Amino acid sequence: MDIELTKIKKVYFIGIGGIGISAVARMFLKEGKTVLGSDVSDGEVVHELREAGIVIQAGQGIDLVPKDVDLIVYTIAIENYDPAFFTALQQQPIPIRSYPQMLHLVTEGKYTIAVSGTHGKTTTTAMIGHILRKVNKDPTMIVGSLLVDEKSNFVAGNSQYFIVEACEYRRSFLNINPKILVITNIEADHLDYYKDLKDIKDAFHELVMKVPEDGFIICNTSDKVVAEVIMDAKAHIINYLDFYHARELRIPGMHNQVDAAAAIAASVQIGVDQTRADIHISTFPGTWRRFEYKGALASGTQVYDDYAHHPTEVVATLEGFREIYPYGKKKITVVFQPHLYSRTKQLLEDFAKAFGQADHVIVLPIYAAREVDDGTVSAALLAEKITHNHVDARAVDSFDDALNLLLAHPFGPDDVLVTMGAGEAYTIGEKLLKKY
């Protein structure tokens, strides 16, 4: 059933607190549609949506779905973790679309700039948007995080440009037809869905082939995996390393320097002067949960939060912290929540080596999300593996145990505390700041 968005007046979102789907909810609210939703969790995004005036029910089930809506939008996670609900949803006499399908609808007919890759998608997407807004290109944006200045993952623009973060999970990004495709990097991830790296490369290759001859693919052509993926591309290939140099950025880390090069490369392809792009990238403030400063404890300990949940991201983030807090001057304690049993199991040895720049690591229980524990991997096993790599690490059974452990720790002005992971580790830092 085709959908004309202009005729849609009332929309119900299932899993509305998801960082991607919530952006579409904000977009529809901005357009004057009536937006309702539900979510099983009650995090920061849900709070922000309620503040914006969206009525959100707690929980999930077919009995919560209104009968008088014109469209139902759902998070693709329910297809796997709640198949009975998904089946019942499909039987409703109301059009339903997944979040990835909605990305196709909202970007249709636009000059779409899609940012893909295993790491750096959010920062690069936000950087491109920051540059284009500074030079009055007035883009619409959907970002996989809350922007610092707007406190939103959606920005409404009035131009042809639509910048969107393109996630590879379950081949979601194949719903998008980009004119400019940015590939930050390609590594093994989402191994609960993909069979292996080859399967991931096949998905990226399919995305590459969607970019037209007069389009652009921005990537690192010297990366062997990426080079294989773009081999048959019809579009113009732009090596973002040609735009790389050490810039003055407000956010530390070599990975952010690389993301900045990719953002500038993309901006230049649509007519932005490179010198102006360089000037504006220096004012980029970052995004929510990416090297985010949360505050200081009464003892003088600095508290940060970061979304890193893949070994490569953990390494890059800790290297960034060591740029500003060198060894011998500060001790870094990381409170890490592994994200997904499948990812932790498949990348266990890489995770074990990723915390080499930390002094202490506290491993929280694994964030299950859409998965079931099969007993083959645990926080305790990861902590043991980290210890074998000469970093002090211990696992805890609960968030409360972690909080009590931290409250008993003699933190001082020479300490830095970093909560890390894609789940809810950030709440530990927030609670500590309230207690101190």
Language-model features: locations:
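A glycine-rich beta-strand to alpha-helix segment
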Residues: A402-K434
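N-terminal leader/targeting and accessory segments in enzymes
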Residues: M1-S98, M102, P252
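Nucleotide phosphate-binding/pyrophosphate-handling subdomain across enzymes
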Residues: D2-K10, G20, M27-E31, Y244-H360
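Short internal beta-strands
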Residues: K33-V40, I217-T221, T333-F336, A358-A368
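C-terminal helical cap/extension that packs against the catalytic core
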Residues: Q302, A352-P413
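Phosphate-binding loop of NTP-binding sites
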Residues: I3-E4, M27-K30, R50, L64-K67, ...
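Short acidic/histidine-rich motifs immediately flanking catalytic phosphotransfer sites
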Residues: K67-L71, Q160, G412-D415
